[in-house]
């Protein structure tokens, strides 16, 4: 698999795609699942309620956001890989957090949800043909390819893991 080219995704997503130097994106997504599981083992239920500042997400909300992102990006990838050309609306992440119940869900359930969602996404990506990987569609009023969405998913996790390490777990 080659890296997505500029024009296959909105410029905004370059901040995620640039975090993924590898080209075997399915392996990256698979390795992240093990990395996430390892990190989650170090966080207690008590610690999962921590937010590093006022109006900042708790660890639980961060994990919930990652699950929401996995679902949104994979939904886009599924539709586009099936040659669905219907434009896909964007979503407002803060609104999703505000209307969630993440802080009242057990940390173990939140982490299991993310890991199972990632596993399902891996199965989807492994099933795609070369042609499907290159299909493009429209999401959030911008063009996006299936392969770009996979790289965005991996970069999105890397972006938030960096924040988790630096702002939540380093204190």
Please state what every model-predicted region is:
Residues 1-15, 49-93, 122, 134-171:
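Short, contiguous alpha-helical
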Residues 39, 43-46, 84, 128-131, ...:
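A short secondary-structure junction motif
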Residues 24, 28-31, 61, 65, ...:
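Alpha-helical initiation/capping and key positions within long helical/coiled-coil segments
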Residues 21, 28, 54, 58, ...:
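Alpha-helix N-cap/loop-to-helix boundary motif
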Residues 21-55:
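Short, contiguous, helix-prone interaction/anchoring segments in small proteins
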Residues 28-39, 76, 97-134:
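Acidic/histidine-rich alpha-helical segments that form the ligand environment
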Residues 20-27, 83-86, 104-105, 109-112, ...:
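Solvent-exposed interaction patches of small proteins and small membrane subunits
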């Amino acid at each position: 698999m080659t890296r997505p080219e500029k024009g296959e995704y909105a410029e905004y997503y370059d901040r995620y795609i640039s975090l993924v130097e590898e080209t075997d994106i399915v392996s990256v997504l698979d390795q992240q699942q093990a990395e996430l599981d390892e990190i989650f083992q170090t966080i207690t239920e008590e610690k999962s309620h921590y937010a590093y500042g006022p109006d900042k997400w708790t660890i639980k909300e961060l994990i919930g956001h990652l699950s929401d992102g996995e679902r949104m990006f994979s939904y886009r990838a599924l539709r586009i890989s099936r040659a669905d050309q219907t434009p896909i609306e964007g979503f407002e992440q803060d609104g999703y957090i505000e209307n969630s119940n993440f802080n009242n869900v057990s940390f173990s359930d939140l982490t299991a949800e993310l890991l199972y969602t990632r596993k399902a996404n891996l199965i989807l990506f492994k099933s795609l043909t070369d042609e499907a990987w290159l299909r493009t569609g429209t999401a959030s009023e911008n063009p996006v390819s299936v392969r770009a969405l996979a790289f965005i998913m991996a970069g999105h996790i890397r972006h938030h893991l960096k924040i988790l390490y630096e702002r939540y777990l380093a204190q």
